[in-house]
């Protein structure tokens, strides 16, 4: 059950990062319905997403890595081929702007889950809203 659960969390994060919001929400619902903690799920997701954010920041910096793969490795993404290819796809799907916003969005989600949205429907909605913010259809603040 542990590895299956872990795989499902990774699939959920991959789906959300790739803009497959409906799939991510469906996986989230399955995990929550199975009794998983919203805070625990978001903590696991945050670990992965912070690495994407770090890679995007490295790529935009003055001493940037030579490739997307190198930036991801430097950010702490596992160097086995499947992990790197999924991370590259996620980073490309999210784009640098949304990747750089992830820490702020994660902090807001964390505060919300630890306050009024700690359980039940409010927790589910807070995480769903976060996935929607990650979606490629979500506009940047300066876009109309």
Language-model segments: residues:
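Helix-rich C-terminal "collar"/helical-bundle subdomain used as an assembly and partner-interaction module
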Residues: 8, 17-144
């Amino acid at each position: 059950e542990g590895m299956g659960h872990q795989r499902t969390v990774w699939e959920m994060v991959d789906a959300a990062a790739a803009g497959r919001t409906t799939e991510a929400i469906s996986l989230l619902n399955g995990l929550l319905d199975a009794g998983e903690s919203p805070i625990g799920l978001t903590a696991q997701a945050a670990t992965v997403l912070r690495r994407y954010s770090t890679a995007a920041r490295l790529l935009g910096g003055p001493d940037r890595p030579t490739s997307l793969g190198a930036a991801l490795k430097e950010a702490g993404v596992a160097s086995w081929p499947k992990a790197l290819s999924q991370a590259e796809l996620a980073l490309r799907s999210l784009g640098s702007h949304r990747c750089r916003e992830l820490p702020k969005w994660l902090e807001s989600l964390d505060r919300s889950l630890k306050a009024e949205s700690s359980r039940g429907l409010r927790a589910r909605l807070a995480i769903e809203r976060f996935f929607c913010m990650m979606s490629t259809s979500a506009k940047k603040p300066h876009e109309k």
